[in-house]
Curated annotation (Swiss-Prot):
Matching Pfam families: HAGH_C, Lactamase_B
Pathway named in the protein's UniProt entry: Secondary metabolite metabolism; methylglyoxal degradation; (R)-lactate from methylglyoxal: step 2/2
Cofactor note: Binds 2 Zn(2+) ions per subunit.
Entry keywords, A to Z: Hydrolase, Metal-binding, Zinc
Lineage, broadest ranks: Bacteria, Pseudomonadati, Pseudomonadota, Gammaproteobacteria, Thiotrichales
Annotated binding of Zn(2+) 2, by residue: 58-59, 130, 170
Function: Thiolesterase that catalyzes the hydrolysis of S-D-lactoyl-glutathione to form glutathione and D-lactic acid.
Source organism of this protein record: Francisella tularensis subsp. novicida (strain U112)
Similarity section: Belongs to the metallo-beta-lactamase superfamily. Glyoxalase II family.
Catalytic reactions of this protein: an S-(2-hydroxyacyl)glutathione + H2O = a 2-hydroxy carboxylate + glutathione + H(+)
Enzyme class (EC, first level): hydrolase
Name this polypeptide is given: Hydroxyacylglutathione hydrolase
Superkingdom of source: Bacteria
Needed cofactors: Zn(2+)
InterPro entries: Clx_II_MBL, Glyoxalase_II_hydrolase, HAGH_C, Hydroxyacylglutathione_Hdrlase, Metallo-B-lactamas, RibonucZ/Hydroxyglut_hydro
Length: 252
């Protein structure tokens, strides 16, 4: 299946994603229903599934309107929320075969306790919601957020094949790289990507694979990068370094 990406240019800088082939469509975390409905109608597709990574409003606001247009579409989510109940409750390791494609569910709490990611192995794509961002990770402001769970979820993602591409729900490239450079100012990867994305519209920013993400993401590098021991000598690599970086990012 092909992957269509839109940037909403709202205050949260949301990305929206749709997978499609000649006949079928899958929507991920719809905030704005109209862009999906227009594309599906124009290309004469059938909306088969709506996948929800977590229940924050900017990931579910468009679900009810899409279901009004496409009542046969099935909603997949870890838990219910204030707007709807899913047709199919998913859990860690759930494997869903839709016939025209399939996906596996990864339970990735930390940003919020109901967060999941959707791994499409054939498409080599991971829809990672607010767990992993380009050059960053999700925030831990929600009531059910847990910084240690977020670390464990990130570790789980880093164990996937390096050629898989993560598709995060927001464009936070610049802010994340600016934070990374505040810690490691001379780092070649941080500087390279900061220069690369500085002048790009969000729609044109690169979609990198996990192998490349591991080089440009300071939170992944917290697991093993000895350069961080010089920058933050009071903290050991791994969970302790990750937690410290996430705390510093909260106030950046």
């Amino acid at each position: 299946m092909q992957i269509k990406r839109w940037f909403l240019n709202n205050s949260l800088r949301n990305y929206q994603y749709l997978l499609y082939d000649k006949s079928h469509a899958i929507v991920i975390d719809p905030l704005k229903s109209d862009i999906f409905a227009e594309f599906i109608a124009k290309n004469k597709l059938q909306l088969e599934a709506i996948l929800i990574t977590h229940k924050h409003g900017d990931h579910i606001a468009g679900v009810k309107k899409l279901l009004a247009i496409y009542p046969n579409a099935k909603v997949y989510a870890y838990t219910e929320n204030d707007l709807f109940k899913p047709d199919i409750y998913v859990k860690d390791g759930s494997f869903i075969n839709l016939g025209f494609t399939s996906f596996r569910v990864m339970y990735t709490p930390g940003h919020i306790d109901d967060h999941v990611c959707f791994l499409f192995e054939q498409e080599r794509a991971l829809f990672c919601g607010d767990t992993l961002f380009n050059a960053g990770v999700g925030g831990v402001q929600a009531e059910s957020a847990d910084i240690n769970q977020l670390y464990d979820s990130l570790v789980k993602i880093t164990k996937l094949d390096g050629d898989i591409k993560p598709y995060p729900a927001h464009d936070y490239w610049l802010g994340n790289l600016d934070f990374a450079l505040s810690i490691l100012a001379d780092d070649s990867y941080f500087n390279y990507y900061r220069n690369q994305v500085a002048e790009l519209a969000a729609e044109d920013k690169p979609i990198v694979n996990l192998a490349e993400e591991a080089k440009l993401n300071i939170f992944i590098r917290a697991m093993s990068d000895k350069a961080l021991l010089k920058a933050l000598p009071d903290y050991s690599l791994g969970r302790e370094m990750f937690v410290k970086l996430r705390q510093l990012k909260n106030n950046f």
